[in-house]
Regions:
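Surface-exposed, low-hydrophobicity beta-strand/loop segments enriched in small/polar/acidic residues
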Residues: 1-166
């Protein structure tokens, strides 16, 4: 059976050196923030010190990490809710903090689906240690809560060594 090419955002696999990928840190999410899906790349909002989804393909600001999930007090029920998705503004009781959990280890390694394929082994090997843009980073599946971010393989280049493909 062939592998399905499903978009799933960035999934942590391990850190450099093979250590456990399970560590996250807590950051606040602004109550008016857009939806953030599990596996979405996030960055620090410049004005409020909260996290937000990485806003656009090709955004040159440094990523903070990858969104793992959140907790907030539901605006309708008043109950604490744990979710792999921040559904967006209007969802939380603004009297309480909205907490987002982010895989933010700079040595973290991820697996991500690509929007295309390399035609042969030599082409794939040539892309190792290059960088590429992430597309669809702001969208996700509202049923599963999983990001639809994927690697734009056509943008692979070796001018920025900060996030190499391995």
């Amino acid at each position: 059976m062939a592998n399905a090419n499903l978009k799933f955002g960035l999934k942590p696999i391990n850190a450099m050196g093979g250590t456990n990928p399970g560590g996250t840190n807590m950051y606040f999410i602004a109550s008016d923030a857009s939806a953030i899906f599990q596996g979405s790349p996030v960055q620090v909002e410049l004005t409020g010190g909260t996290i937000q989804i990485s806003t656009a393909t090709g955004d040159q600001r440094q990523l903070l990490g990858v969104f793992a999930g959140c907790e907030y007090v539901d605006a309708t029920t008043g109950k604490l809710k744990f979710s792999n998705t921040w559904p967006g503004s209007g969802s939380a009781d603004t009297n309480f903090d909205i907490k987002g959990f982010v895989y933010d280890n700079p040595m973290q390694r991820y697996v991500i689906c690509s929007d295309g394929t390399n035609t042969n082994r030599a082409t794939a090997k040539a892309d190792l240690f290059k960088t590429a843009e992430i597309e669809n980073g702001t969208s996700g599946n509202t049923t599963t809560g999983i990001s639809t971010a994927q690697l734009d393989i056509s943008t692979a280049e070796d001018s920025d060594p900060s996030n190499p493909l391995m």
